[in-house]
Amino acid sequence: MSHPALTQLRALRYFDAIPALEPHLLDWLLLEDSMTKRFEQQGKRVSVTLIREAFVGQSEVEEASGLLPSESRYWLREILLCADGEPWLAGRTVVPESTLCGPEQVLQHLGKTPLGRYLFTSSTLTRDFIEIGRDATLWGRRSRLRLSGKPLLLTELFLPASPLY
């Protein structure tokens, strides 16, 4: 199963540098904290619609080439993050199999738990970068995060109902 928003997410084109945008947009796009928490601060009940969770080969995560270690298998999680049942964000997480050792194994078992609820409670979380992307009228971003120094790639597309717009 797939979702049209995930097709748009994969079509994001990234800026080489942070573009000159309205402060309101940058506030959302460069947020270092949990997007789940940010949505909850809007007074909304946040839920996850799980689209896909599975191990995949390198050919299904080409966007991670050069950003993550080259491995034969990656854990792929694709979701819609909803606020009061309305999709606000499409998310795609790519995790190298080598990252999934020790406590990070929990990344395979999040189910309908928002990724941010796990990541941002970890004292070992660091972020290497945030890149801003755009596809037609929609904004997105991607970040390489590390848990205990082990990388994962998180890509987010802000959907039209999102307060970013």
UniProtKB/Swiss-Prot annotation:
Pathway: Cofactor biosynthesis; ubiquinone biosynthesis. Removes the pyruvyl group from chorismate, with concomitant aromatization of the ring, to provide 4-hydroxybenzoate (4HB) for the ubiquinone pathway. The lineage of its organism: Bacteria, Pseudomonadati, Pseudomonadota, Gammaproteobacteria, Enterobacterales. It catalyses: chorismate = 4-hydroxybenzoate + pyruvate. Belongs to the UbiC family. PANTHER family: CHORISMATE PYRUVATE-LYASE (PTHR38683:SF1). This is Chorismate pyruvate-lyase. One of its GO terms (molecular function) is chorismate lyase activity. InterPro entries: Chorismate--pyruvate_lyase, Chorismate_lyase_/UTRA_dom_sf. It comes from the Bacteria. Monomer. Its EC number is 4.1.3.40. GO terms for cellular component: cytosol.
